[in-house]
Amino acid sequence: RMYNTNDIHTVLTMIERDSNGLVKEKKTEVRPSYTSVEDDMIDLRVMPLRNYALTSYLQSRGVDIGIATTFCKEIHYTLRNKKYFAIAFPNKSGGFEVRNPYYKGCIKNKDVSVFYHTNGMTQEHICVFEGFMDFLSYMTLRKKGNTEICVDGMVDVLVMNSVANLRKSMDYLEPYKEIHCYLDNDIAGQKTVETFIGLFGGKVKDESARYREYKDLNDLLRGKKR
């Protein structure tokens, strides 16, 4: 037990506190910076994902475009008299995780994203991802028939969109027989999995060992070892 308590409220409060103060690993790759744009944003338009620059970016990350267009949208907006566009991944609160090669952020409310294999039905198994790029990477690997990484059979999916959304994830995870966690191989990912184990016990399966040589599923997809 990481937090020496069985009280769920106490555990959630502690993990949310810790997720805001985790030491970040050093990276040699330039990653998009996180920013919030909603307050100064105007002329917001959401449309099917077709922009060549965005689809090329996803292809550079190894993501199958057919999968990307199934789960993602394209968003355009004006910010401080300049026009921008990005990939938009919808969440349960009607908001979007937005990303392009230069930044990532959130428009409207921050929340988890959930996808059910069969509409109106819950499967016995669910796969949990930290961000939508990892989810798209997993679906790409699944399409390629990769059985070393992917779970067999029908599964539902929860994308946390941030480890700080652990509390919001709980209600969705409770009904499942097995919870397969495909989180990052870093401190934040490890703590989140350990917290899930503390809350849900043996139902939680830490799948990060399947890609232990990589930071996350997208790095695995691209063959980029740590």
Q: PLM features: residue spans?
A:
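Surface-exposed charge patches
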Residues: 56, 136, 198
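Terminal-region recognition feature
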Residues: 30-33, 53-60, 69, 207, ...
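TOPRIM fold recognition
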Residues: 2, 124, 140-226
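Phosphate-handling DNA/RNA-contact segment within nucleic-acid enzymes
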Residues: 77-172
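Non-catalytic accessory segments of DNA primases and related replication-initiation nucleases
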Residues: 1-57
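Helix N-cap/coil-helix junction residues
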Residues: 5, 63-64, 126
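Electropositive nucleic-acid engagement tracts
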Residues: 37, 46, 50-80
